[in-house]
Design a protein with these regions (language model features):
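Left-handed beta-helix
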Residues: 9, 14-15, 20-21, 26-35, ...
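A contiguous, basic/glycine-rich beta-loop/short-helix subdomain that forms a polymer-engagement track
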Residues: 57
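A general structural motif
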Residues: 5, 12, 65-68
Length: 131
């Protein structure tokens, strides 16, 4: 079922993810939501958002991957995450009523009522040399 949905929409939501009511994806191509992600109520995501894992822990004795560990972020209620944002890690929580700007890369928690964005310089435009 997940593969059919991904093929038709370009959205990849692991069936183990927990998603609250009022969840909305706008222009969903490229959205990835990992297995242990927890999403609160009234959360809105835009295209290309990743709610992913930093790593998949291995058992030191056997080298086998260990299941049952929280690897993906928590997104509390009333959060908007704009296009291209990547939020990683099982201990990462996005506090309620926050906004995550486009192309932001987060691996740490932010408090409620936060706005996170990249502060980038303006693009430089140069004349192209004639040949």
């Amino acid at each position: 079922m997940t593969e059919i949905a991904h093929a038709r929409t370009g959205i990849d939501i692991h069936p183990g993810a927990t998603i609250g009511e009022g969840f909305f994806i706008d222009h969903g191509t490229g959205v990835v939501i990992g297995e242990t992600t927890v999403i609160g109520k009234n959360v809105k995501l835009y295209q290309g958002v990743t709610l992913g894992a930093l790593s998949f822990p291995k058992d030191e004795a056997t080298g086998m991957l260990m299941k049952g560990h929280k690897r993906h972020p928590n997104v509390e209620d009333n959060v908007v995450i704009y296009a291209g944002a990547t939020i990683l890690g099982g201990e990462t929580t996005i506090g309620h009523d926050s906004e995550i700007g486009g192309n932001v890369w987060l691996m740490e928690s932010i408090p409620p009522f936060s706005r996170v964005y990249n502060q980038t310089p303006y693009p430089r435009i140069k004349a192209k040399k004639e040949t």
